[in-house]
Regions:
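N-terminal auxiliary segments of SAM/dcSAM-dependent transferases
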Residues: 1-50
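Conserved alpha-helix/loop element of class I SAM-dependent methyltransferases that forms part
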Residues: 9-11, 33, 37-40, 54-78
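Glycine-rich helix-loop-beta junction characteristic of Rossmann-like nucleotide cofactor-binding loops
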Residues: 68-74, 95-96, 144-145
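Helix-to-beta-strand junctions that scaffold the AdoMet/dcAdoMet cofactor pocket
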Residues: 74, 97-98, 171-175
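Conserved class I S-adenosyl-L-methionine
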Residues: 74-85, 102-104
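S-adenosyl-L-methionine
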Residues: 104-160
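C-terminal substrate-binding/active-site "lid" region of AdoMet-derived donor-dependent transferases
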Residues: 112-115, 165-231
Length: 232
């Protein structure tokens, strides 16, 4: 059986691939045909190339497979991505927003951003790499044009929710959305994960966010949750 691809029943620009053995995987339409980013499989179906989206490598994909009901990132959106690393999830976000959208990729590690530029951004017209620390959004405000529709945050910092909220105050439009992947051990190894998640949720609520969903990411990521919230 040839691999097949069909649109996801809920989320625009996200797809479901049915592989030769019947296994189902998430996929996105490849904005840079012929190139993969992290060794993911490329599938050609009805003249279009898709990239398999590995939920063990991407917390956003894991959250979708764990039943996330809201994925605010959509075609045409401007997205601020905090903690883009070498571009695994950011490249799929690039696929989703498409040529009419844009992804501003903030990353502090120089090695990671070199890989992001050389392997990803060079081949995608809708990505801007920014070598800066997400704790100081004022340092990169000149690189971001207007307000963004969404912020995606995946940074290993103790004050993750505060950092995201500081960025939202500066860059996120009213009624915009955020997705934040919280890793308990990055915040406090001495506390129970549930206590940490609740603390980060409280920070967001105190900073004008309406938390809509909290999804645990096991078995794809241990002691992680994905929080989806709307601003003001």
């Amino acid at each position: 059986m040839q691999a097949k691809v069909k649109p996801h029943p809920k989320f625009p620009a996200i797809y479901e691939a049915i592989l030769e053995d019947g296994a189902q995987r998430l996929a996105t339409k490849n904005l840079a045909p012929g190139r993969n980013v992290y060794g993911e499989r490329l599938i050609r179906y009805e003249g279009v190339e898709y990239r398999i989206w590995d939920a063990y490598r991407s917390k956003m994909a894991a959250a979708i497979l764990k039943g996330l009901k809201t994925v605010p990132i959509s075609p045409g959106h401007k997205v601020l991505y905090l903690g883009a690393a070498s571009g695994t999830t950011a490249s799929h976000v690039s696929d989703i927003v498409g040529e009419k959208g844009h992804v501003y990729c903030v990353e502090f590690a120089s090695r990671a951003i070199r890989e992001l530029i050389d392997n990803v951004c060079m081949y995608r017209i809708n990505m801007s790499p920014i070598l800066e620390d997400a704790r100081f959004p004022e340092k990169y405000s000149l690189f971001i044009t207007g307000k963004v529709d969404d912020i995606y945050c995946d940074i290993a910092q103790p004050e993750q929710a505060k950092i995201l909220a500081d960025n939202a105050d500066m860059f996120l439009k009213n009624s915009g959305w955020i997705m934040i992947a919280v890793k308990a051990q990055s915040i406090d190894v001495t506390k129970e994960p549930t206590e940490i998640y609740n603390r980060e949720i409280k920070v967001l609520e105190n900073r004008s966010f309406n938390v809509r969903e909290v999804v645990h990411l096991e078995p794809y990521d241990k002691a992680h949750v994905m929080i989806v919230a709307q601003f003001r």
